[in-house]
């Protein structure tokens, strides 16, 4: 909404047009806004969660160091999502269909995660929302969204899969392949980030790095000058540039959330945060046609999810034998004797390296 205000004010005050005309300025402003909103609302939110006794449930078979986390305020993801939506309404171009799609993704997956957390933490339902019901809701939404995105993106012929580190190699996709790929990316990312969110600050830093990386790609691909110079397919779909603005909002809010989520965590994001942030990253990757770059930058999430699948498969197929001491894999390292902070920081380092590899693919082609 503010861009319309600044556009009107620019007729009377010279220089204010930068806030409405330059997307780079709005990227900076929305990241600052989302950061400040999260910082401002963080303490009241934590106090309210404590008052309502909405606290973390800790598994008895987990690392002993986790017992101190019991009853730590959870569902802090509401803080992140609210900040992102408010910031987008303030600084986003509200005529962009892509911005509204991302807001809808936040609301839908946020509702699923909120209901799951509410069942577990408030109503004390042991397993929360049943996995099959959660998967069904995610799947229906993802398939419908993938079909919508196919028709939106195909208007400008942007239906090719971009191959990293290649100047001209693109794989064309029809609607079936596109929908299937988008389905697995959105659902897989949502659940992978959810599995990664098991230690203080572990998930939010990789989320911020991946959001920043995808935001950079979105900015380049929707800028004809940069896209031509760097030999990218120019994505000229009206409003698609707002994806970069949205990514900046996620980065700002995520960094502010880390202020409260760093060890020892004062609040956890819960399923309402992790499921939603994962889904949003997947949708963004599909929108900007950088699914493989997303795989590279988000490989930590893939490994976390894969460790769970391997553990479950091994347990069922090998008569109860396990590959890891505990899954997801970050718990395996804890049970090997690594302090929680060392596990988290080393995973952050890995995530940063993956981000840099994905970033290098912009020029090394």
Curated annotation (Swiss-Prot):
UniProt GO MF annotations: metal ion binding; phospho-N-acetylmuramoyl-pentapeptide-transferase activity; UDP-N-acetylmuramoyl-L-alanyl-D-glutamyl-meso-2,6-diaminopimelyl-D-alanyl-D-alanine:undecaprenyl-phosphate transferase activity
Biological process annotations from GO: cell division; cell wall organization; peptidoglycan biosynthetic process; regulation of cell shape
InterPro entries: Glycosyl_transferase_4, PNAcMuramoyl-5peptid_Trfase, PNAcMuramoyl-5peptid_Trfase_CS
UniProt key word Transferase: yes
TM segment ranges: 22-42, 74-94, 95-115, 134-154, 168-188, 201-221, 240-260, 267-287, 292-312, 342-362
E.C. numbers: 2.7.8.13
Membrane topology listed for this record: Multi-pass membrane protein
Keywords (A to Z) from UniProt: Cell cycle, Cell division, Cell inner membrane, Cell membrane, Cell shape, Cell wall biogenesis/degradation, Magnesium, Membrane, Metal-binding, Peptidoglycan synthesis, Transferase, Transmembrane, Transmembrane helix
GO cellular component: plasma membrane
Highest taxon listed in the record's lineage: Bacteria
Pathway in which this enzyme or protein is active: Cell wall biogenesis; peptidoglycan biosynthesis
Residue ranges that the Swiss-Prot or TrEMBL entry lists as coiled coil: none
Reaction(s) catalysed by this chain's protein: UDP-N-acetyl-alpha-D-muramoyl-L-alanyl-gamma-D-glutamyl-meso-2,6-diaminopimeloyl-D-alanyl-D-alanine + di-trans,octa-cis-undecaprenyl phosphate = di-trans,octa-cis-undecaprenyl diphospho-N-acetyl-alpha-D-muramoyl-L-alanyl-D-glutamyl-meso-2,6-diaminopimeloyl-D-alanyl-D-alanine + UMP
A Pfam family annotated for this UniProt entry: MraY_sig1
Compartment list: Cell inner membrane
Reported cofactor(s): Mg(2+)
Biological role stated in the UniProt entry: Catalyzes the initial step of the lipid cycle reactions in the biosynthesis of the cell wall peptidoglycan: transfers peptidoglycan precursor phospho-MurNAc-pentapeptide from UDP-MurNAc-pentapeptide onto the lipid carrier undecaprenyl phosphate, yielding undecaprenyl-pyrophosphoryl-MurNAc-pentapeptide, known as lipid I.
Recorded family membership: Belongs to the glycosyltransferase 4 family. MraY subfamily.
Cited PANTHER family: PHOSPHO-N-ACETYLMURAMOYL-PENTAPEPTIDE-TRANSFERASE, PHOSPHO-N-ACETYLMURAMOYL-PENTAPEPTIDE-TRANSFERASE HOMOLOG
Record NCBIfam families: mraY
Name of the protein: Phospho-N-acetylmuramoyl-pentapeptide-transferase
Organism for this UniProt entry: Francisella tularensis subsp. holarctica (strain LVS)
